[in-house]
């Protein structure tokens, strides 16, 4: 048998040749983790030492998960889907991708889930690209001050709490006080801008529904479709039946879709309905991940949850395309308590709040905006000049009216000036009432507010103020060019005011009966004028309830 010999030079040469031809890129490293526990939409996974925060993981049955807690021995994973098929011991693989959603104009008119998957049975969506959910908000130098108006079509808001493009305006109030109605009216009011075809005017809208009933979301979609607003709106839906992880991610998915348009130089309006339910979902997820609870059992970073979301709404500088994203977050309060944890957090983050009062809503004052508590911190710079001029004294007059109304409940007799304040205040409150899904063009609002603040409605009975307003606006549309002039110039000058005064005097001649102070219209009978003695005896008496 021949003796086996090893030549050291041959071994050395073979190793050198292998090292020279070796390409590290051809080697593939695969990390595999295993599920240790899975329940309540949360899985704990051992292994995967190189996993990234917010990386997508894939379970054996194809379900995706989101890596959250990166502990030394295991990972806390939010399961994005049905967790019933995930069991202990199953393999988990990395995808190497952070959570992102598809974006693009193809999403307009569609209803998608928080992962960007269509759920409206209208086929697949061809996305232009994808965008990560966790993105840094624009910095200070990338922004521009808010200076363009975002019209809601609601007189009470556009006159006293104006909103600008790029602003974050909180809508806060108890349940069933009309919060969603204001947001939907604002979306519907963008129809004229969309129909104009002018990119600088058009506003793409995103409605993020968090934790609502599926029937409610379907009703919102139908309302938008009936009013011609669905074609420029995307609905991101995470109904109450969704896992808590989906409700937590839905607002970020909506903002990612909006940011794509904003950085493309377009204008976006995004509605978060509502962030109270997102905070509750995040609390549930955090407690299941065994994170330390804080005040009201919310995790310590619940402020950061909302701040990093709302800071993405901005008016970009001209160098970045001058696009904007306006945010309307909604918060539900309990018993009108705005001093609770989540409401105070979001109030401190946003640029103002619209507070809806349940007492006003129940008194049929809708929209039920409490003007005394509501404020817009930056929207005043974006208000059109004509509206700023006519509404300058409106907030003060309403405040004086509320004070006098409280005083009149206990006073048996009032002087003429006090009665005048009550007369005008009651008519201004009636003027601010507005039906749902019937937003007003800004020029119509200017004329209505002008008529109220200048005393032209003082001789109109309160119950006929809305009819007077409707018929006067129709009169102007058919017999005057004042509305067209206001729409084009947005300026209420002396000539326009004089023409308006002349028009309203002429209109009253046909609207009022001859020689008396009562209206004669459809369903109204003429009466004799009240004598001066009877007027002097007018008293305001507190009504017993």
From Swiss-Prot:
Translocase as UniProt keyword: yes
Gene Ontology cellular component list: plasma membrane; proton-transporting ATP synthase complex
E.C. numbers: 7.1.2.2
Membrane topology type: Peripheral membrane protein
Signal peptide: none
Transmembrane region(s): none
MF annotations from Gene Ontology: ADP binding; ATP binding; proton-transporting ATP synthase activity, rotational mechanism
Keyword terms of this UniProt record: ATP synthesis, ATP-binding, Cell membrane, CF(1), Hydrogen ion transport, Ion transport, Membrane, Nucleotide-binding, Translocase, Transport
Gene3D superfamilies in the cross-refs: 2.40.30.20, ATP synthase alpha/beta chain, C-terminal domain (1.20.150.20), P-loop containing nucleotide triphosphate hydrolases (3.40.50.300)
EC class name: translocase
InterPro entries, per the entry: ATP_synth_asu-like_sf, ATP_synth_asu_C, ATP_synth_asu_C_sf, ATP_synth_F1_a_nt-bd_dom, ATP_synth_F1_asu, ATPase_a/bsu_AS, ATPase_F1/V1/A1_a/bsu_N, ATPase_F1/V1/A1_a/bsu_N_sf
Site (Required for activity): 374
Binding site for ATP: 173-180
Chemical reaction(s) catalysed: ATP + H2O + 4 H(+)(in) = ADP + phosphate + 5 H(+)(out)
Family assignment from sequence similarity: Belongs to the ATPase alpha/beta chains family.
Stated role: Produces ATP from ADP in the presence of a proton gradient across the membrane. The alpha chain is a regulatory subunit.
Quaternary structure (record): F-type ATPases have 2 components, CF(1) - the catalytic core - and CF(0) - the membrane proton channel. CF(1) has five subunits: alpha(3), beta(3), gamma(1), delta(1), epsilon(1). CF(0) has three main subunits: a(1), b(2) and c(9-12). The alpha and beta chains form an alternating ring which encloses part of the gamma chain. CF(1) is attached to CF(0) by a central stalk formed by the gamma and epsilon chains, while a peripheral stalk is formed by the delta and b chains.
Protein's UniProt name: ATP synthase subunit alpha
Species annotation: Pseudarthrobacter chlorophenolicus (strain ATCC 700700 / DSM 12829 / CIP 107037 / JCM 12360 / KCTC 9906 / NCIMB 13794 / A6)
Organismal lineage: Bacteria, Bacillati, Actinomycetota, Actinomycetes, Micrococcales
């Amino acid at each position: 048998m021949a003796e086996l010999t090893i030549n050291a030079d041959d071994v050395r040469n073979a190793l050198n040749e292998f090292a020279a031809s070796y390409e590290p890129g051809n080697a593939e490293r695969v990390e595999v983790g295993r599920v240790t526990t899975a329940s309540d939409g949360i899985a704990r996974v051992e292994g995967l030492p190189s996993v990234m925060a917010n990386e997508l993981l894939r379970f054996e049955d194809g379900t995706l998960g989101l890596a959250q807690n990166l502990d030394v021995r295991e990972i806390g994973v939010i399961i994005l889907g049905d967790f019933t098929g995930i069991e202990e011991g199953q393999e988990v693989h990395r995808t190497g991708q952070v959570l992102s959603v598809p974006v693009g104009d193809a999403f307009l008119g569609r209803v998608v889930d928080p992962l960007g998957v269509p759920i409206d049975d209208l086929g697949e969506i061809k996305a232009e690209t994808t965008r990560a959910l966790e993105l840094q908000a624009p910095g200070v130098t990338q922004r521009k001050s808010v200076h363009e108006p975002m019209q809601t079509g609601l007189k009470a808001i556009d006159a006293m709490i104006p909103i600008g493009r790029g602003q974050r305006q909180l809508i806060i109030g108890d349940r069933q006080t009309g919060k969603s109605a204001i947001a939907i009216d604002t979306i519907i009011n963008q129809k004229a801008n969309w129909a104009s075809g002018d990119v600088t005017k058009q506003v793409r809208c995103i409605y993020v529904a968090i934790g609502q009933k599926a029937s409610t979301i379907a009703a919102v979609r139908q309302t938008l479709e009936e009013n011609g607003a669905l074609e420029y709106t995307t609905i991101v839906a995470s109904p109450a039946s969704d896992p808590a992880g989906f409700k937590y991610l839905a607002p970020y998915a909506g903002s990612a879709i909006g940011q794509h348009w904003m950085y493309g130089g377009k204008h976006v309006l995004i509605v978060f309905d509502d962030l109270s339910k997102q905070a509750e979902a995040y609390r549930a997820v955090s407690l299941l991940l065994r994170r330390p609870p804080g005040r009201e059992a919310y995790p310590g970073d619940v402020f950061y949850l909302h701040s990093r979301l709302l800071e993405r709404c901005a008016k970009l500088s001209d160098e970045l395309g001058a696009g904007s994203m306006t945010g309307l977050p909604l918060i539900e309060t309990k018993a009108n308590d705005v001093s609770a944890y989540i409401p105070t957090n979001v109030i401190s983050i946003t640029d103002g709040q619209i507070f809806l009062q349940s007492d006003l809503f129940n008194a049929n004052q809708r929209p039920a905006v409490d003007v005394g508590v509501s404020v817009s911190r930056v929207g005043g710079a974006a208000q059109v000049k004509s509206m700023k001029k006519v509404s300058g004294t409106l907030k003060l007059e309403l405040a004086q009216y509320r004070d006098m109304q409280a005083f009149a409940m206990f006073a048996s007799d009032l002087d003429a000036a006090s009665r005048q304040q009550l007369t005008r205040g009651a008519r201004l409150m009636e003027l601010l009432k507005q039906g749902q899904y019937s937003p007003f063009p800004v020029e119509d609002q200017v004329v209505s507010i002008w008529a109220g603040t200048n005393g032209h409605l003082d001789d109109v009975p309160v119950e006929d103020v809305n009819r007077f307003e409707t018929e006067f606006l129709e009169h102007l549309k058919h017999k005057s060019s004042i509305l067209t002039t206001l729409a084009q110039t947005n300026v209420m000058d002396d000539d326009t005011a004089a023409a308006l005064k002349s028009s309203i005097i002429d209109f009253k001649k046909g609207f009022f009966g001859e020689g008396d102070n009562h209206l004669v219209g459809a369903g109204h009978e003429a009466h004799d004028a009240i004598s001066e003695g009877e007027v002097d005896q007018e008293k305001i008496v507190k009504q017993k309830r």
